[in-house]
């Protein structure tokens, strides 16, 4: 290929051709007006296609109100919690329920910060411009994650309902919080490396790292509020459709002697409405997050494997892979996945 700069540049005569061609086609002008006024995505919407797209599904899970990650990178956390809340709602017959996403967000920030500083200690001999050290420093406490990270957090810290630890401005819109935290973590990394180069031993460096984690906790607590150690939980089970029906005498629980006499029935189904909510209640006082998870969530988060479809020549299918330096909870280990063909991936989603 030629290295002549003039041959590689955008030429003025071509620009004139481009603009002439653009203005010759009226469709381009209409599209430009629409995109400039409404935005590219709205302007590009095919409304005939929208009307033709079916909104009925062969598999549909009813799981309460819609959750919203807003302007944060917690998609993996919301998806994982929604998996558990579906099972919890059905197990305990609840109309709606939502876990606290902020609770896991707090501990994820703490754990990622700790793991980052540990990785810094593991790579003190790496050059600062090495690919490994650059990868470690890319986003020390960024929001992203996947199932194994979620499972590691739940195993260690449990879960709480949203009422016990609601959303905050910095969980809904995490950019400023994480930008500041990442900046401080990189400052800490630079000082650890400076102390190491000056001859500091492991004990001194670990003492310094523990002090830094105290600062990290303060940043997280100021930004998100402290997570609860214990909390109270109250919920009512939902009304069953059958409860609204009058007794017909065929139910085994019917207490009337004369099954043909509806007035003689003393079943709960025929009691007059009092206006008092008599649905069964779930009440917990001073329960811990781990106790809540073990008692009320009918799912073991460790009973899952991560599947991926990465059609790369260097990564053959049907093998398990581990990604170095990818842990959020350091003692839980790095992330692993099984690389499978797309048809296996689809079947797993349906099954």
Predicted regions and their residues:
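Structured alpha-helical subdomains that flank or immediately precede key functional sites
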Residues: 1-69, 77-351
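Catalytic cores of glycan-processing enzymes that make or break glycosidic bonds
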Residues: 73
């Amino acid at each position: 290929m030629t290295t002549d700069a003039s041959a590689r540049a955008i030429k003025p005569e071509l620009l004139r051709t481009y603009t002439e061609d653009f203005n010759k086609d009226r469709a381009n002008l209409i599209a430009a007006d629409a995109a400039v006024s409404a935005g590219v995505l709205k302007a590009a919407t095919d409304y005939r296609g929208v009307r033709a797209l079916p909104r009925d599904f062969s598999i549909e899970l009813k799981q309460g109100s819609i959750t919203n990650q807003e302007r944060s990178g917690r998609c993996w956390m919301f998806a994982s919690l929604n998996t558990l809340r579906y099972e919890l709602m059905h197990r305990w017959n609840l109309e709606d329920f939502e876990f606290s996403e902020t609770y896991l967000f707090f501990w994820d920030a703490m754990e990622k910060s700790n793991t980052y500083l540990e990785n810094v200690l593991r790579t003190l001999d790496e050059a600062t411009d090495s690919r490994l050290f650059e990868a470690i420093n890319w986003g020390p406490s960024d929001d992203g994650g996947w199932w194994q990270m979620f499972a590691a957090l739940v195993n260690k810290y449990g879960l709480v309902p949203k009422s016990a630890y609601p959303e905050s401005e910095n969980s809904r819109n995490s950019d400023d919080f994480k930008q500041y935290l990442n900046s401080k973590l990189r400052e800490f990394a630079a000082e650890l490396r400076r102390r190491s180069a000056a001859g500091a031993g492991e004990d001194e460096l670990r003492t310094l790292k523990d002090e830094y984690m105290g600062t990290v906790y303060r940043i997280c607590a100021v930004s998100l509020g402290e997570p609860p150690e214990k909390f109270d939980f109250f919920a009512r089970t939902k009304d069953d459709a059958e409860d609204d029906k009058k007794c017909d005498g065929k139910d085994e629980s019917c207490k009337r002697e004369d099954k043909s006499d509806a007035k003689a029935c003393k079943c709960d189904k025929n009691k007059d409405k009092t206006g008092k909510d008599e649905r069964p209640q779930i009440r917990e006082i001073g329960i811990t997050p781990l106790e809540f998870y073990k008692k009320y969530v009918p799912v073991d988060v460790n009973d899952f494997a991560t599947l991926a479809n990465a059609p790369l020549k260097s990564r053959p299918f049907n093998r398990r892979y581990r990604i170095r330096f990818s842990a959020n909870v350091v003692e839980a280990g790095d992330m692993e996945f099984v690389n499978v063909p797309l048809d296996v991936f689809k079947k797993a989603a349906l099954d």
